[in-house]
Amino acid sequence: MFEQNDDRDRGQVGIGTLIVFIAMVLVAAIAAGVLINTAGMLQTQAEATGEESTDQVSDRLDIVSVSGDVDDPDDPTQINNISMVTATAPGSDPVDLNQTTAQFIGEGGEEMFNLSHEGVFINSIQGVSDEPDNNVLTESSDRAEVVFELDGAPGSYDIGYEALDESERLTVILTTDAGASTEQEIRVPSTFIEDEESVRL
């Protein structure tokens, strides 16, 4: 009436259980390995993103002063170039001005260009190489003058942006290679004073 299990049947059941157990252990080990690998990748990605975000905040320029030259000191009507004295922001890594972009936004439209543009001139004031291909602000004490030649300025080259009239406003955004931006609002005086070659903006 009743089936009798002999030692052979019990042995087969034991082997089957062992195989299932080993399979479960292998699956768990593989899953753990995948989780560890994924966690490592996410941590690396998070660190890289964090460093990039830090660079975008800290590796930026400070604008120390802004001035402009008038078209004719005897009868001034327009600003035909803009001069910015630049430095690195506190805590910033070195900034290569040749890899920095400028964006002009105002009544004359919008223009974006690199500071290596032929209508931009970079002059060393302190701590910056005079070589055109090595305009790097390294120390916080370094200073460089960036001159933007506007349309109508004397000479062969300009950045393609119109000269500024009295009372005109202009927004200039400088963005470093790290992606950090500095915005400067420029306001041209409502009246020019005769015999002044430049004005503070």
From Swiss-Prot:
Its main location: other. The keyword Transmembrane does not apply. One of its GO terms (cellular component) is archaeal-type flagellum. It holds the Pfam family Arch_flagellin. InterPro entries: Flagellin/pilin_N_arc (IPR013373), Flagellin_arc (IPR002774). Residues 1-11 form a propeptide. GO terms for biological process: archaeal or bacterial-type flagellum-dependent cell motility. Keywords: Archaeal flagellum. GO terms for molecular function: structural molecule activity. It is found in: Archaeal flagellum. Belongs to the archaeal flagellin family. Flagellin is the subunit protein which polymerizes to form the filaments of archaeal flagella. This is Flagellin B1. It comes from Natrialba magadii (strain ATCC 43099 / DSM 3394 / CCM 3739 / CIP 104546 / IAM 13178 / JCM 8861 / NBRC 102185 / NCIMB 2190 / MS3) (Natronobacterium magadii).
